[in-house]
Amino acid sequence: MKHYLIIGSGLIGRLTSWRLIQAGHAVTILSSDDKAGTDSAGFIAASMIAPFTEAVTADRSIRDLGIQSQALWDKWLPELDKPVFYPKTGTLVVAHEGDKAELARYQRRAAHILDADDYQKIDAKQLQNLSPELAENFQSALYFPEESCLDNRQFYQQVGEFLTKHTNWQTIEPIETLTNATLEQLCQQTLGHSLNKFTSVIDCRGNGSKADLKDLRGVRGEVLRVYAPEVNLQQCVRLMHPRYPLYLAPRPDHQYVIGATVIESEDRSPVSVRSAMELLSALYSIHRGFAEARVLEMRAHCRPALPDHLPTIRQQEWGYQINGLYRHGYLLGPVMVEQLLTKLSEQTDSGVRYAS
């Protein structure tokens, strides 16, 4: 049996550990976060699985990789002990009258990037049938029927409980840099044995890997979570706006996660007043029922990004780094982990050869 050491327990650390165990391997996790994962970007994310709408503002590869990830979510989630909220109700892209030019620009880009059957333009009657409450404020929309989202809190809890049962999961201080020497010292001090016990090490630290990935940077995102008993939106919604295009993802029990901001900053301070006002104003403009919603959380985090905004898997002398998921953790995480597992399966039984 191969034995892997996972450094980090955010979304990618959890996915990697879970899939390695399901493949029949042993896993040890070392992480500076708590087991609930409350300090990870994936814990506060909207967790939309939106290969088509994301590709429109990125490139075709996001669509193609995202479709592969979506198939993996379909396959993997039923393996958990309890169901995870995973509505496959699509995404509606809308704009207010003054921002119709933004929607038209988005549609032209979609026609260039996507296939014709990836989305459809719907009129007021079709929107009324699909989402009556959204039709109260909008007369048309672009509909992406194959998109979805999942409840990241449920997922974190379910996978966290699984990993607690099936791994040796230790909490440690943050590690600034990974080398054979620092890993050997870490193993001796924390686990009481040599690094050589492990087939390979997988670095899943996200922003924690900055000292080792010189081109990695953090991109700040700000997210609200609200309880809105007067709102019954079933689809994910994207609101076009020239400064802060907003996305909204439903959760069980009339909860919604709302985000918009992509700020080139590594500031982890609380949500700014300006961002909160813009988010709440845009939210109210989508549905008047949000006027009486209760704000449950305002959170900010920094998502790890590389210059091309695409994820990477890099081999090191001690193992692999998987990083740079940017705002696409839930969209591209599964396919990246699947690629990593393929690389690991191609290793010889001796695994990565540690330098002396």
Annotated model-derived regions:
Residues L15-A23, M48-I49, V84-Y86, S200, ...:
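Active-site substrate-recognition segment that forms the wall
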Residues K82-H96, R108, D118-E161, T261-S265, ...:
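Helix-loop-beta segment of a Rossmann-like dinucleotide-binding subdomain
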Residues Q22-G42:
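Glycine-rich FAD pyrophosphate-binding loop
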Residues A293-S356:
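C-terminal catalytic lobe of FAD-dependent flavoproteins
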Residues L5-I7, N196-N207, V337:
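Short hydrophobic core segments
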Residues A46-L130:
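Dinucleotide-binding Rossmann-like beta1-alpha1 core, especially the glycine-rich loop
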Residues K2-T28:
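N-terminal Rossmann-like FAD-binding beta1-loop-alpha1 element of flavoenzymes
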Residues A141-S200, C204:
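Helical element adjacent to the flavin cofactor pocket in flavoenzyme catalytic cores
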